[in-house]
Amino acid sequence: MPNYLFVYYGGMSEAPPPTPAQQKKTMDVWMGWFGKLGKTVVEIGAPTKPGKTVSKAGARATGKDGVAGYSIVKANSLGQAVNMAKSHPDIAQGMKIAVYEIMPM
């Protein structure tokens, strides 16, 4: 069964950082979702901080729509992995998830 990379976009706002209670609530929602995915979760992953996009022209800030984090899951097909991503509770709040099959090396 192939591994798939979930790349989370959104959630990088210029609002004040969340309170510890807000962070816990968000983490509880995410962990509940991972719990529903069960053994298909290979790596929960981690959130990311704002970064830079590097090209021949130089480096520029990624901005609020940059990568917000990643996870790795197992699925039988890209379609199944996409359906798993669609079930994420933050999709309703505007988060986007790009899904990529990870090629074995």
Predicted feature locations:
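Conserved, structured core segments of small domains
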Residues: 1-105
